Regions:
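Glycine-centered C-terminal helix-capping/turn motifs at helix ends
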Residues: 267-269
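Membrane-proximal, non-catalytic sensory/regulatory domains of signal-transducing membrane proteins
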Residues: 163-172
Length: 270
């Protein structure tokens, strides 16, 4: 994967107005207040859907979320099952951690169940709001901690951005998060990559960065699949050899044993 340029983008302007719109959306959806006839929708549809799932499951925004770690025996199973994911992601996580060092954001890698399997970046363990979401084995699924970029990326299967009060719980409204799902060489979701800041300036452009990094991790997972032949695909006019390539792993008998998402988009029948 190519190096990641240190990120110094300017924070998004209009922060207080945006937070006010989110606050009105919370009152309307989470507390049932009637929206005015001229009120413009302040939420992405998938955020409102997530909020309503949380409400339907008995969660309430004023309650304290359960930042629990999975039991030791279950964690051992997660570690064994996700060893390849952690190894494939580590080089990208390390480069990403350096690239976002000056942004007050840090990186979290989870498995497909939303359990933290690795982290990187400037992580202040003295801040409990940081510590509870960066412990290896922390369960950050929607069922446990409500609407977050982690749960949303895993459910929606697409890159997402959430800012402050777009998270479900009042206690998680300090976070701003970008997330992207990770797909393995079998085409199934293997986990997700998250960038989180606490009381940080809104940077929705981080969704693009996390998506690029997720692509690199997916390619590393595919390249790690045993193969006798690796086929690279790209469109006319594109140069082969970068992270946009479609990757096909083929065994000695000519059977395809794995493919990255780009290859599956180019060849839908895979």
């Amino acid at each position: 994967m190519a190096s990641i340029t240190p990120f110094h983008g300017a924070p998004t302007t209009g922060g207080q107005d945006r937070l006010a719109r989110i606050g009105r959306a919370r009152q309307a959806v989470l507390y049932g207040e009637t929206r005015g006839p001229d009120a413009a929708p302040a939420l992405e549809g998938w955020i409102e859907s997530s909020w309503r799932r949380c409400l339907a499951s008995g969660q309430r925004p004023e309650h304290a979320p359960s930042f629990d770690t999975v039991p030791a025996a279950e964690m051992r199973r997660h570690q064994e099952a996700n060893q390849q994911l952690v190894q494939a992601a580590k080089p990208t996580l390390e480069r990403l951690g350096r690239a976002i060092a000056d942004t007050r954001y840090f990186a979290i890698l989870t498995n497909q169940a939303g359990v933290v399997v690795d982290v990187n970046g400037r992580i202040d363990r003295s801040d409990s709001r940081v510590d509870v979401i960066t412990r290896i084995g922390a369960d950050l699924s929607e069922q446990r901690v409500g609407t977050t970029a982690i749960g949303a990326a895993l459910i929606e299967r697409q890159p997402v951005w959430l800012h402050r009060g777009e998270h479900f719980f009042d206690a998680t409204s300090v976070y701003s998060c970008a997330g992207a799902p990770l797909f393995g060489p079998d085409g199934h979701c293997a986990g997700m990559l998250d960038l989180t800041g606490i009381e940080a300036a809104e940077r929705p452009e981080l969704k693009h960065l996390v998506t690029q990094c997720a692509r690199g991790i997916e390619n590393a997972l595919t390249l790690g699949r045993p193969h006798a032949l690796l086929i690279r695909l790209n469109w006319p006019g594109r140069t082969l050899g970068d992270d946009t390539d479609g990757l096909l792993c083929v065994d000695a008998d000519g059977r395809i044993t794995g493919a990255n998402p780009a290859a599956r988009q180019m060849i839908p029948r895979l």
